[in-house]
């Protein structure tokens, strides 16, 4: 009798296991969105926006942090048709894209701005299948924060940097206009003097290992001098993936946001991702 009862219990348990497995297998996966999602990330200084392509819910993707020009915001980037050309190309790679508030409109790559972006990056990574890798794109003033994030002492690792008409030399920005000087002094808490070399991303880059860089600049730019920013920084570019794109026209002109430049930008980050993936598989 005891054996019969044990046999019946075993049979029942097996049947329940099969039924449970079948029920689990019968549940279809949630459908992927057909268009990239936009996730709003709130901070006191203003919102940031994470763009997630559908593929980055199914497969692991890297994150590109985009830092905005002076006097602008993540909302301006989100609404900009020109910036959207670049973002759409990155989403197609596929890469997730964080349009960062950078701690305010005129933070000039300050330590406080970098700390806020570090927290935004961590929060953004919880919203998609993040592989842990991060890249940076800086527009004009945003070049300082993007470059600083890839240098020793940054609160998070960055595998490559793209600057479009980007500032790299904080001392150069501080010395070219009184309005910039006042904003930089406020952002960095300076007591009237110029920024110390250890606050200047270009000075730090000149002492650090070479970086994968994608630099877009114009000799006609009368806002961010090409020779004292992009040209000097080009000397710190890692051979191989790095690219220097010289264009004509004024600061942040329309040709910076052309499909051609967007394709070059996406290809740059795509190459870095392919290399990083290959290296990870070898470990």
Task: Please tell me what each predicted stretch does.
Residues 7-19:
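Bacterial N-terminal signal peptides
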Residues 25-59:
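N-terminal cap/lid segment of alpha/beta-hydrolase-fold proteins
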Residues 60-70:
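Short beta-strand element of the alpha/beta-hydrolase
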Residues 77-97:
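Short amphipathic alpha-helix adjacent to the substrate-entry channel of hydrolases
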Residues 108-128:
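Alpha/beta-hydrolase active-site loop
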Residues 127, 132-180:
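Primarily recognizes the serine-hydrolase "nucleophile elbow" in alpha/beta-hydrolase
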Residues 174-231, 235:
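The feature captures the conserved acid-bearing segment of alpha/beta-hydrolase catalytic domains
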Residues 231-283:
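C-terminal catalytic histidine-bearing segment of alpha/beta-hydrolase fold enzymes
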């Amino acid at each position: 009798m005891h054996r019969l009862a044990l046999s019946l219990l075993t049979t029942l348990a097996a049947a329940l296991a099969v039924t449970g497995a079948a029920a689990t297998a019968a549940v279809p996966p949630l459908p992927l969105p057909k268009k990239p999602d936009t996730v709003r990330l709130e901070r006191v200084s203003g919102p940031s926006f994470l763009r997630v392509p559908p593929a980055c819910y199914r497969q692991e993707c890297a994150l590109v942090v985009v830092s905005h020009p002076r006097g602008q915001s993540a909302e301006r980037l989100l609404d900009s048709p020109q910036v959207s050309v670049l973002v759409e190309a990155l989403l197609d790679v596929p890469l997730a894209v964080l349009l960062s508030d950078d701690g305010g409109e005129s933070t000039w790559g300050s330590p406080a701005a970098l700390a806020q972006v570090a927290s935004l990056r961590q929060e953004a990574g919880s919203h998609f299948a993040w592989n842990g890798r991060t890249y940076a794109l800086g527009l004009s003033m945003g070049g300082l924060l993007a470059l600083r994030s890839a240098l020793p002492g940054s609160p998070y690792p960055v595998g490559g940097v793209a600057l479009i008409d980007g500032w790299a030399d904080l001392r150069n920005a501080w010395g070219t206009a009184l309005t910039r000087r006042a904003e930089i002094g406020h952002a960095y808490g300076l007591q009237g003097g110029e920024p110390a070399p250890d606050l200047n991303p270009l000075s730090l880059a000149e002492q650090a290992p070479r970086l994968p860089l994608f630099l877009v600049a114009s000799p006609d730019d009368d806002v961010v001098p090409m020779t004292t920013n992009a040209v000097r920084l080009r000397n710190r570019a890692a051979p191989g993936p790095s690219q220097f794109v010289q264009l004509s026209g004024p600061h942040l002109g329309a040709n910076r946001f052309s499909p051609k430049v967007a394709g070059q930008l996406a290809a740059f980050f795509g190459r870095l991702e392919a290399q990083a993936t290959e290296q990870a598989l070898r470990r």
